């Protein structure tokens, strides 16, 4: 049979998706984290894979879904949090922009699955299914009550789930996980479609969202989930030593306040007394596209006058960051390869060919 007749849409999808195959899975498995360091990889949106010097693997907010895929329905879902926020009716054109860099069904070595809150782009049924099917039968699922309710509803056994609220500490091998206050006001207006928010006191944040501080033997990582800027970042900075801080950054559309701005990112880094501040989430949605270099421009303008003790780092999805080896770098570039050039004789017509 000719190729053009045997190839189908399904065969095309299976041969190209996920775009990175198991490349990053293999890289993470092979990584030997040196003493006094920790390594992490950006999985897209606020998804992070963290690996400690003891070989402990945890993932946070790993999401494998997508955004809008059709113009079929021109209207936003009734009661959507963005509709509540801005009084809009039109469909939000939020298309997923980055590739899928990690295959959840190729995960074999993992010690905990975490989520910061229950928004669709921060918790994933495919990840839960893959871990349940292919990994050790004691891997815990850790998150606030709303996340645990989702996991249990998907079929994760209740005894595998750990509900956390601010102040709780969970130890996973050599990583100490501190659940801290979250500041995600959008989460508080994420309600059933028939429930009104106007004139009603919101319920508590603690059941819906948490921030995390991961304390490893080689340093600490602060994961802010979808939190907006809050004065309470300074309280967290007073109470904990924070080496690297991750903040949800984006270019908010007109009438919307859902992501931190470049100024907010700098304020967060300063308030937390962090050493490095890294924006994330700006990659995922086409309508929140932002230029993270703006953060560095503002940092350059203010750092000497305000005596900043931190540096910004501009990352790429699928890239690795190692603390403290990368603490003085400003921007990530994917490995360029060809470091072994001229280890064998080139095969060219003559030396000056290229």
Swiss-Prot record:
GO CC field: cytoplasm
Induction summary: Induced by L-ascorbate. Repressed by UlaR.
EC number: 3.1.1.-
Localization: Cytoplasm
Cofactor(s) in the UniProt record: a divalent metal cation
GO MF entries: L-ascorbate 6-phosphate lactonase activity; manganese ion binding
Pathway assigned in UniProt: Cofactor degradation; L-ascorbate degradation; D-xylulose 5-phosphate from L-ascorbate: step 1/4
GO biological process: L-ascorbic acid catabolic process
Entry keywords, A to Z: Cytoplasm, Hydrolase
Segments passing through the bilayer: none
Stored InterPro entries: L-ascorbate_6P_UlaG, Metallo-B-lactamas, RibonucZ/Hydroxyglut_hydro, UlaG-like_MBL-fold, UPF0173_UPF0282_UlaG_hydrolase
Function comment: Probably catalyzes the hydrolysis of L-ascorbate-6-P into 3-keto-L-gulonate-6-P. Is essential for L-ascorbate utilization under anaerobic conditions.
Similarity section: Belongs to the UlaG family.
Protein name (database record): Probable L-ascorbate-6-phosphate lactonase UlaG
């Amino acid at each position: 049979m000719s190729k053009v007749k045997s190839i189908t849409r399904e065969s095309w999808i299976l041969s190209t998706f996920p775009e990175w195959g198991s490349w990053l899975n293999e890289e993470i498995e092979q990584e030997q984290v040196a003493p006094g360091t920790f390594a992490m990889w950006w999985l897209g949106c606020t998804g992070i894979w963290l690996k400690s010097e003891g070989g402990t693997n945890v993932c946070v907010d790993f999401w494998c879904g997508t955004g809008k895929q059709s113009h079929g329905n021109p209207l936003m879902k009734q009661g959507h949090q963005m509709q509540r926020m801005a009084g809009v009716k039109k469909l939000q054109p939020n298309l997923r922009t980055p590739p899928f860099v990690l295959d959840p069904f190729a995960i074999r070595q993992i010690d905990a699955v975490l989520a910061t809150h229950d928004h669709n782009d921060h918790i994933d049924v495919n990840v839960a299914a893959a871990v349940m099917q292919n990994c050790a039968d004691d891997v815990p699922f850790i998150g606030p009550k709303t996340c645990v309710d989702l996991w249990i509803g998907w079929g994760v056994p209740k005894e595998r789930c750990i509900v956390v609220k601010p102040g709780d500490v969970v130890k996973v091998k050599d990583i100490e996980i501190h659940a801290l206050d979250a500041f995600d006001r959008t989460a508080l207006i994420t309600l059933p479609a028939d429930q009104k928010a106007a004139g009603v006191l919101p319920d508590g944040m603690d059941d819906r969202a948490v921030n995390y501080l991961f304390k490893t033997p080689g340093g600490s990582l602060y994961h802010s989930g979808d939190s907006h800027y809050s004065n309470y970042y300074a309280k967290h900075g007073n109470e904990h030593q924070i080496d690297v801080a991750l903040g949800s950054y984006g270019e908010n559309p007109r009438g919307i306040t859902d992501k931190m701005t470049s100024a907010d990112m700098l304020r967060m880094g300063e308030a937390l007394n962090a050493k490095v501040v890294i924006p994330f989430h700006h990659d995922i949605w086409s309508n929140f596209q932002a230029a993270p270099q703006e953060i560095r421009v503002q940092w350059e303008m203010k750092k000497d006058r305000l005596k900043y003790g931190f540096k910004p780092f501009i990352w790429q999805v699928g890239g690795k960051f190692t603390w403290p080896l990368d603490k003085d770098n400003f921007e990530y570039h994917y490995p360029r390869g060809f470091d072994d050039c001229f280890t064998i004789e080139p095969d060219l017509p003559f030396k000056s060919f290229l």
